[in-house]
């Protein structure tokens, strides 16, 4: 039923559905961290993605993989699984609440990367000043990671050295997700394979959990509530986003997503009970502004084209 509804959506309707992902994803970083504190980085992530996969199968049914080309399934699986592993583990491996929010901000370079990917690989027209948005986004990350001193290359490097694994995985997550979005938009994928991708992610995480031998999971009321909330935000977010990028306007979706870093930082700060300095918010605003500049560069070029 939902599959038929998805096929009948107009581009504007599909774009509107995709925009719901902004609300869901704004809560993800704080919830993933909270789950990892209750159930462990790997075990908690495995539980989240298993529950999210079940939720997606209930809502959308079993995906018909025969509708997708083998090459798309291979590359989309690679990008999606890589993205989710990097996202969950970068947050789970963060050393403290402040670092969790910083890692989340690095992850939110993906809107900028997605728009750049649309320009480079999907022939999306853009003005030359899209480069300014790209630079501004990275400058914002430098401010965020520079600490209370603001923009500082040496401070940023010193901060990254305290936990390079989390920061590198967060950057990889942004690149993987941009690649997945670009690929899905390029092939105009018919249908929704997100449930299949989530199943792959959960299987890999469970394999890592059992191979690590990290002990039993903590199934108390709080951990189950947070895990259910995180799984719901993940599952519903990706489900509606996939509808949006498959049938809607990816440039509009990527541009609207520049609100996520600010919303996410607010929610994460509240959930993790960690105050954030003025310099952090300045850097977060620069990341948002950078992605919006990239978006405007494509929108301006698109209007002139027609």
Language model: regions and residue ranges:
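Membrane-interface helix termini and inter-helical loops of multi-pass transporters
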Residues: 30-38, 91-96, 145-162, 209-227, ...
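Specific alpha-helical transmembrane segments that line the substrate/conduction pathway
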Residues: 43-54, 92-122, 250-269
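Hydrophobic/aromatic residues within transmembrane alpha-helices
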Residues: 35, 44, 90, 120-122, ...
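Hydrophobic/small/kink-forming positions within alpha-helical transmembrane segments
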Residues: 23-26, 30, 57, 77, ...
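Hydrophobic alpha-helical transmembrane segments of multi-pass integral membrane proteins
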Residues: 13-17, 42-59, 70, 74-75, ...
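Hydrophobic transmembrane alpha-helices of multi-pass small-molecule transport proteins
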Residues: 51, 56, 78-80, 126-149, ...
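Glycine-/small-residue-enriched transmembrane alpha-helix faces in small-molecule transporters
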Residues: 1-43, 82, 139-142, 152-186, ...
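Specific transmembrane alpha-helical segments of multi-pass solute transporters/efflux pumps
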Residues: 24-31, 63-101, 143, 228, ...
């Amino acid at each position: 039923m939902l599959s038929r509804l998805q096929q009948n959506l107009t581009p504007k309707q599909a774009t509107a559905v995709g925009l719901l992902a902004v609300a869901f994803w704004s809560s993800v970083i704080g919830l993933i961290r909270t789950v990892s504190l209750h159930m462990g980085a790997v075990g908690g992530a495995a539980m989240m993605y298993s529950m999210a996969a079940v939720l997606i199968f209930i809502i959308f049914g079993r995906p018909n993989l025969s509708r997708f080309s083998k090459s798309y399934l291979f590359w989309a699986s690679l990008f999606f699984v890589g993205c989710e592993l990097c996202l969950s583990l970068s947050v789970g491996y963060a050393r403290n609440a402040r670092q969790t929010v910083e890692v989340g901000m690095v992850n939110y370079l993906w809107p900028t990367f997605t728009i750049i990917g649309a320009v480079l690989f999907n022939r999306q027209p853009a003005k030359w000043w899209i480069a300014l948005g790209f630079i501004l986004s990275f400058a914002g990350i430098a401010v965020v990671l520079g600490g209370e001193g603001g923009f500082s290359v040496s401070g940023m490097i010193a901060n990254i050295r305290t936990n390079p694994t989390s920061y590198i995985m967060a950057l990889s997550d942004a690149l993987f997700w941009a690649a997945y979005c670009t690929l899905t938009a390029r092939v105009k994928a018919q249908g929704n394979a997100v449930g299949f991708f989530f199943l792959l992610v959960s299987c890999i995480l469970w394999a890592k959990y059992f191979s690590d031998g990290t002990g039993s999971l903590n199934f108390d009321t709080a951990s189950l509530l947070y895990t259910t909330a995180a799984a719901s935000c993940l599952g519903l977010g990706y489900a509606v986003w996939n509808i949006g990028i498959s049938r809607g306007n990816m440039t509009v979706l990527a541009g609207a997503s520049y609100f996520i870093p600010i919303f996410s930082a607010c929610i994460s700060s509240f959930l993790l009970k960690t105050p954030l300095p003025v310099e952090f918010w300045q850097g977060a605003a620069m990341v948002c502004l950078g992605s919006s500049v990239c978006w405007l560069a494509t929108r301006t070029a698109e209007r002139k084209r027609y």
